[in-house]
Every structure is written in C-alpha cells, then in structure tokens.
C-alpha cells in the first residue's frame, strides 16, 4: 500500500478538532506532531475550536461531562488529582476553583498558595505563598500574560484586591470599587485575560462590567438588551473565544432567551459602550424546567454553552430541586433531557462547584514565576 502524505495545513485542521486527552497520546507519533504542543498559535486555535464541557464536584470527587450531539449522549469522567510528594486530597484542593483558558486554579483551606491544573494533560504546578487566597476570587492576566487573582465582593464601596500568582507574598494593590455598582447578577467570564460580569447599577440598569488587569480599572463595558427583573437569572458565556452570549431565564415562566454579540469583543478601555450590538438568537420554553434559587453572587445552579459549530444549539447543565444534575440540549423546538447519574450526594449548593470548562492544551508551566518559592510537580 502506498502511503499518502496529507498537506500539513489539513493535518492541523483535523487535529484542531481532536480533544486534548486524545492529542496527548499522539505526541509520540512524530516530532512535528509533538512540536504542536509548543506552538502558541496551534494551542490558541485549538482552544477556539474546542467544545466546552461541564465540570462539577461532589463531596469527594470531581467530574467532567462531555456532550456528544450524535445521540445525543454524554460521557462522564472522574478527574483525579494525583500529585507525587504532596499529601493532598481532592476535596481539600477543590475547596474553591476557577478556570481561565482551560487551566483550573485551585485553592486549599489547608495550604497557603494556589494549584494550577490542566486535568486533560495531567499537569499541575503549585505556587506557594505566605497567605491564604480569598474564598471569592477570579483569575485573569495582564498584557504580559502574568496571571493574577482578583479578590472581590462587589458591594458599594467594597475593596478589590489583586494578587499576582508567582510572587511569594506580594499584594499588588487595593482598589475601591464604584459605589454606583449595586450587585453582581451573573457568573464571571474571562476573555483574553480581562474579566466580565453582568450586573445592576443603582438605577436598575443592566450592564456588563469589566476589570482589566493591565490597567487595574473596573469599568462599565456595555448595556445589556433587557430590563432588570428580580425573577430573572442571568448567565454570561464566551462564544468561540471572541464573542459574548447571554442567557436569561425567567424563573416564573421557565422561558429562556439567548442573545449573542454581533461582532468580536475587544478589550477596550472605555466607559459606557453603546456600539456593542446584541442579536436575539432564540427564545425557548423548556417544560418542567427546575425553579432555581435566587443568589446574589456567582450562581452555581446553572451553566451553559452554545455549540461552536451551530450557535442555535443550546446546552444547559443545572440542578433540580432535589439536587439531581440534568443536561438539556435544545435545538429549535426539540429538547433532550439527560440525567447525570452519580452515587453520592452533591455539595451544598452555596458552593460554586458547577461550571462550564473548555478543555485546552495550555500548560501550567506557561505561568511565569518571579521567585524560588515554587514547586513544579
């Protein structure tokens, strides 16, 4: 049989669509394939094309849930955190965790520092510190790709504190938040290192607020295409790594509306932005959709994504009133409901433990350090 060499551009296009856990096994095929893991362009392009998954933890374990639309059906994987030389348990390190560009940043109530973890590449990096990281925090990075932690409360006149990961004991700066900002109404998302939230100002307007780690400024990014209603639940998501989508759930009617920004989002340092155009993508009514409790801060009860290849396919993961986890796949007027069967009870829902996660080839070793108080595991 005569071997056929495909054009390298076609090989890359195929590999873009292969999940990270499978790509990791292909590193031994040839040097050229192995070099892709060090190619920033390939890593970034793969992240754009990677299909989001759901992640959640129980009292003792952590799981990822991949959705396959051909059935549809789901794959549930238990994620293990095995760190040689460090006596740790999964519940301790997953006391709180956030994600940024496919990396999980985990904090422990027993260890002072932060663990950076890519569960698909099975790579971790542990940064020691002389302080515990806050319980409410989000992760982003500045224009030099230095990862930083934002400690936030987002109440009038509350302080915003920045910590730089890789510095052993440096608290960068305390910042006063804008007192006109009333309450955070959605989860936070990170886009190109900048953080975004949906929320309400004192005049009941609905906006997206942003925080830039490059300028250390908290600003109003744009107005949202809806009115404030305390019965609504909002969720913000990144679509194809360059646009925002917004989900609004009316808890009374179970009607769900989805908007999508028309154009790519740039990290613009401006005040109120009126030129962000939102397109109403769909309105759906899911029968017997659970009634979700109201929460002021990052809602752990509902998370979602839009299919990268078909923006009008909506996938939602949420709890019902009995804390059972379900996935809803919505395309036009067809709704598929899939139960996630687990043998242990979920954590108290006050814990932020249900998330959308994008598998990536980003390695923890790409996080820079400025001191020798570092463990590479």
Curated annotation (Swiss-Prot):
Domain of life: Eukaryota
Domain F-box: start-end pairs: 1-46
Pfam families given in the database record: F-box, FBA_1
InterPro entries per the UniProt record, alphabetical: A_thaliana_F-box, F-box-assoc_dom_typ1, F-box-assoc_interact_dom, F-box-like_dom_sf, F-box_dom
Entries under PANTHER family matching the protein: F-BOX ONLY PROTEIN 10-RELATED, OS09G0372900 PROTEIN-RELATED
Protein name as it appears in the record: Putative F-box only protein 10
Organism for this UniProt entry: Arabidopsis thaliana (Mouse-ear cress)
